[in-house]
A protein has these predicted regions:
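Juxtamembrane helix-loop-helix connectors linking adjacent transmembrane helices
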Residues: 99-101, 120-124, 140-237, 289-292
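Juxtamembrane "helix-exit" motif on the non-cytosolic side of transmembrane helices
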Residues: 20-30, 53-56, 81-92, 135-147, ...
Length: 342
């Protein structure tokens, strides 16, 4: 029997929350109030994120909060309060943290509110919003804390996911983003086909020739592999596919609709590849600039660009970020589990 759409979102949220909670409780040296509050906040942020993939929820949010600017800022104010409260819980509240959190949440919302009158294409306002969401985390401009504090995930990643989905779906009303989380047959089909093509013809040949991948000798227990895949899907695949396929590729394709779709796919894949320029996986080529030496992970950039091409194909074929996010999790999971000694 097919799971009803809303039931799927509830079951998925609850399942992620239970799994994440059990893992953290089993690994904790002691169960503190801070840990329990952190887990509750994690569950809340996962639930709101997953709920916004339900078209009925999106429609209700648009009717409730999408009619005037003050109403539109109410959910973001909720995220801001959660952020401040969590920083207080960790004794990590600073004036700069408050200011950067405020700017991170409200500037994209204001820009996208005034961008609603324009066509759903790449404009300077939504480009600025995308860069703020991306670079504030990439450059550690927002507080670098985890949830839970010990052994958790980046707190602002969950804040970013909620805010970017809310800003573009509810405020900007970008209905072409393709934010859907319930998989169908096409999602699995394209994910598996492109996974096989990428690994067989690109990842393994290029990876071994360049020394980027090595057969691991320290195997993790097999039961951990599905958990690794789920973690990568939620905290790497989903955010990166939202950003690079659902927003950057999508808006560029709309902006340059008279340009070959393959060129847009190529261009967005190159952007995706160079977004990994700060990764620390050898081999490197060293660039000397302003008296400093910068290691450039050239093999990583090449393979990421090629992978980005296949992620983009999955996005184009399905019209959803889900297929590329699944494919992304499969690719990274394959690398992490089987070929990454680190």
């Amino acid at each position: 029997m097919k799971i009803q759409l809303r039931n799927f979102h509830i079951l998925f949220s609850v399942g992620v929350f239970i799994l994440f909670t059990l893992m953290n409780l089993l690994q904790a040296d002691q169960i503190s109030v801070s840990l329990l509050v952190s887990l509750v906040l994690f569950g809340l942020l996962i639930f709101t994120l997953v709920s916004m993939s339900d078209p009925k929820v999106v429609d209700a949010l648009q009717r409730r909060f999408g009619n005037n600017l003050l109403s539109a800022l109410i959910p973001l104010t909720g995220l801001f309060i959660i952020t401040i409260g969590y920083l207080i819980l960790l004794n990590g509240l600073t004036p700069s943290g408050v200011m950067m959190s405020f700017l991170y949440l409200y500037i994209p919302a204001l820009l996208l509110w005034y961008d609603r009158q324009n066509d759903q294409i790449m404009t300077w306002m939504n480009l600025t919003s995308i860069l703020i969401v991306w670079l504030f985390i990439e450059l550690d401009l927002v507080p670098n804390v985890s949830i839970p504090q010990e052994g958790g995930i980046l707190f602002f990643l969950l804040i970013a996911l909620n805010s970017i989905v809310y800003n573009f779906l509810i405020i900007r009303r970008l209905d072409t983003m393709g934010y859907r989380l319930q998989p169908n047959k096409d999602d699995w089909k394209h994910s598996c086909i492109y996974l096989g093509l990428f690994i067989a013809f690109f990842a393994i040949p290029i990876g071994f020739i360049t020394g980027f991948i090595h057969q691991t000798t320290n195997w993790s227990p097999l039961w951990q592999f599905p958990i690794i895949l789920l973690g990568i899907f939620l905290f790497t695949g989903l955010p990166e596919e939202l950003l690079f396929r659902g927003l950057i590729h999508n808006l560029l394709a709309a902006r340059f609709n008279n340009t070959s779709p393959l060129f847009i796919l190529f261009f967005s894949s190159i952007i995706f590849g160079f977004a990994h320029i700060n990764n620390n996986d050898p081999p490197f080529v060293y660039v000397h600039l302003f008296g400093n030496e910068f290691p450039i992970p050239w093999a990583y950039i090449i393979l990421s660009s090629i992978a980005g091409w296949f992620y983009g194909l999955a996005y184009i074929r399905t019209g959803s970020i889900l297929a590329p996010a699944i494919l992304h999790a499969m690719v990274d999971g394959w690398w992490v589990y089987f070929f990454n000694p680190n």
